[in-house]
């Protein structure tokens, strides 16, 4: 069995809405291992993105716990939580969130500079990752000069440049046409295999989700394996 990266134990989430107690997630159990790809599908509002935020330590469960590399995220102070998250997790969203005033190379360097790498080390690692996503020749271009697919590739390069244990992606192909969506997903799966990174992708697209080794369905705040899925 490959290395266990993330583990959910009885995770629930509820919010107060006026005088109402709104439950979003119900007693979820989930394990994410290195090199494993997991797709999470479900209708809008089913709790997919909430779960991803909790897995990433961006939100905390109301019940249960999440372990990242064996550490219970609820017990950590903000500094330790941020350090653990930055070291072991990468994030990709539907919108690329590239900084428009910087080049593709500078955007990909950013997590390494935040992590106190020298500019020389950061530039070398960022260029190597841009080459892996097929953007080395576009490294000096700003976000506005890149196509939609190129911007998302740059965002994925930025998420992977720190070599995280797991990449969490929320609708990463949602703003792309079908051809670009397939290309971006192909690249993510190739890099997952090459780098040994765990991959968790939230998507509404059943066809794309079918490419993952494991597909889970979120319905009414509960998570179940998809019938007929590969794993």
From Swiss-Prot:
GO terms for biological process: lipoprotein localization to membrane. GO terms for cellular component: plasma membrane. Its EC number is 7.6.2.-. It is found in: Cell inner membrane. CDD domains: ABC_MJ0796_LolCDE_FtsE. The keyword Cell membrane applies. It comes from the Bacteria. This is Lipoprotein-releasing system ATP-binding protein LolD. It comes from Neisseria meningitidis serogroup B (strain ATCC BAA-335 / MC58). The lineage of its organism: Bacteria, Pseudomonadati, Pseudomonadota, Betaproteobacteria, Neisseriales. The gene is lolD.
């Amino acid at each position: 069995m490959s290395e266990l990266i993330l583990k959910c134990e009885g995770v629930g989430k509820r919010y107060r809405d006026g005088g109402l107690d709104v439950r979003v997630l119900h007693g979820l159990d989930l394990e994410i291992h290195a090199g494993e790809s997991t797709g999470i599908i479900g209708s809008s509002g089913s709790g997919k993105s909430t779960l991803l935020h909790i897995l990433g330590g961006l939100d905390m469960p109301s019940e249960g716990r999440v372990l990242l590399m064996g550490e219970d995220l609820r017990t950590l102070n903000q500094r330790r939580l941020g350090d653990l998250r930055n070291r072991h997790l990468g994030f990709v969203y539907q919108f690329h969130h590239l900084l428009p005033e910087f080049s593709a190379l500078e955007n990909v360097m950013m997590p390494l500079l935040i992590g106190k790498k020298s500019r020389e080390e950061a530039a070398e690692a960022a260029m190597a990752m841009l080459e892996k996503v097929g953007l080395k020749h576009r490294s000096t271009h700003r976000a506005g000069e890149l196509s939609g697919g190129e911007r998302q590739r740059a965002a994925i390069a930025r998420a992977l440049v720190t070599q995280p244990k797991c990449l969490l992606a929320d609708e990463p192909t949602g703003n792309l046409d079908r051809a670009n969506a397939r290309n971006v997903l192909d690249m993510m799966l190739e890099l997952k295999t090459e780098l040994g990174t765990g991959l968790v992708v939230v998507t509404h697209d059943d066809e794309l989700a079918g490419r993952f080794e494991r597909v889970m369905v979120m319905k009414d705040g509960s998570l179940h394996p998809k019938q007929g899925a590969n794993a």
